[in-house]
A protein has these predicted regions:
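N-terminal secretory signal peptides that target proteins for export/translocation
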Residues: 1-3
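Bacterial N-terminal signal peptides
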Residues: 5-16
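Sec/Tat signal peptide C-region and signal peptidase I cleavage site
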Residues: 17-21
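Amphipathic alpha-helical scaffolding segments comprising HEAT/armadillo-like alpha-solenoid repeats
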Residues: 24-41, 62-74, 96-115, 124, ...
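Core register positions within helices of long alpha-helical scaffolds
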Residues: 25, 56-59, 85-93, 126-132, ...
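Alpha-helical, heptad-rich or low-complexity scaffold/stalk segments
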Residues: 37-93, 121, 158, 215, ...
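Positions within the helices of HEAT/ARM-like alpha-solenoid repeats
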Residues: 45-50, 64, 78-85, 118-125, ...
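Long amphipathic alpha-helical scaffold regions
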Residues: 77-94, 153-185, 211-219
């Protein structure tokens, strides 16, 4: 009970003054209470408890995901195991067959959490979760993170693993004045996604390309 109350207090502290989630679940709990109850039961004792808790947490949507992500502390303090367990479980639950209706809101929560997070290691963890559930509509949002030295690799992996990102990748590749690093990232994405339609663009980059860029293009 003490743990639950501590978590609930921390969640309330994260909310703007006077703001509370209004939607109630079947047990008449708001999102803050659902999250506090769920976190207090983790790690789950059985698969049945895991599925029940993750189902309830996933049903809180973007609000719940943002609350849990907002409790992450700088990764070097090593106090994030339960929170990461919860976020990973929510993502897994929302992407499981039959739970697709939950995925969009979970994805939205991860996007907002990444935008608000200031710790690189935590941003990377959140991005790794987004990579598991991102949709084509997220491609334009993900693309600028190719310029983030810490998250660039996570961003390109997300663009590769997400179905339907091909138009955004091609549009980016057609821009003038792309840096060599951006060309290498795009060439890698084209290869991983087997995008033969990008071959004319890649061949056009070979003229004047540095050795690393040329090697990536040929790969």
């Amino acid at each position: 009970i003490i743990t639950r109350l501590f978590i609930l207090g921390a969640l309330i502290a994260l909310l703007p003054a006077g703001v509370a989630a209004q939607q109630l679940d079947a047990r008449q709990r708001n999102a803050e209470t659902v999250v506090a109850d769920g976190l207090a039961q983790l790690p789950a004792a059985t698969p049945a408890v895991f599925n029940e808790v993750m189902g309830e947490l996933a049903a809180t949507g973007s609000a719940g995901v943002e609350m849990i992500a907002g409790m992450l502390t700088p990764a070097d303090k090593g106090k994030n195991a339960t929170l990461e367990y919860a976020l990973n479980g929510i993502t897994a639950y929302a992407t499981a067959p039959g739970n697709e209706a939950l995925c969009a809101d979970v994805r939205k929560g991860l996007v907002r959490a990444i935008e608000r997070c200031a710790d690189n290691a935590n941003r990377a963890f959140l991005f790794s979760q987004l990579q598991l559930c991102s949709a084509a509509e997220d491609a334009a949002w993900i693309l600028p993170y190719l310029d983030d030295s810490y998250l660039a690799d996570y961003a390109i992996r997300a663009l590769i693993s997400t179905p339907g990102t091909e138009p955004v990748l091609l549009a980016e590749a057609r821009k003038e004045g792309l840096a060599a690093e951006r060309k290498r990232a795009l060439a890698y994405a084209f290869a991983e996604k087997r995008m033969t339609q990008a071959e004319p663009l890649l061949l056009g980059w070979l003229g004047g390309a540095d050795a690393r860029t040329a090697e990536q293009i040929y790969n």
